[in-house]
């Protein structure tokens, strides 16, 4: 069973919210620019994800894969915006393509395709941090 929740998807995006440790040179980057997007993936999203405990990483990965496979553009955008990011999403990519780009950066050798959706179980919010 793979535990998922939309909050895990939002956790990935929270690294793009304003924080005391954010490098000021990154603020205002345009994610439609490929170099800027790569920089944000490398400097913000990946280190933040890497800092999560293993079980949270696993759930973020599973939740992101589920979102890519089954959510529409509107819900993908809403999950991105729920983290109150400092960056507008790229205007030259669909939200799904943006999510796939982030997936490729975080999990370069893994496929996001889901063959057995019944393996994925949505857990309640109060269970997010329970192993």
What are these regions (language model features)?
Residues 2-6, 31-35, 54, 58, ...:
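Alpha-solenoid helical-repeat scaffolds
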Residues 1-45, 103, 125-128:
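Short terminal alpha-helical segments
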Residues 77-131:
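Amphipathic alpha-helical binding modules
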Residues 22-75:
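Amphipathic alpha-helical interaction modules
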Residues 12, 16-17, 63, 79-80, ...:
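C-terminal catalytic/scaffold cores in eukaryotic proteins
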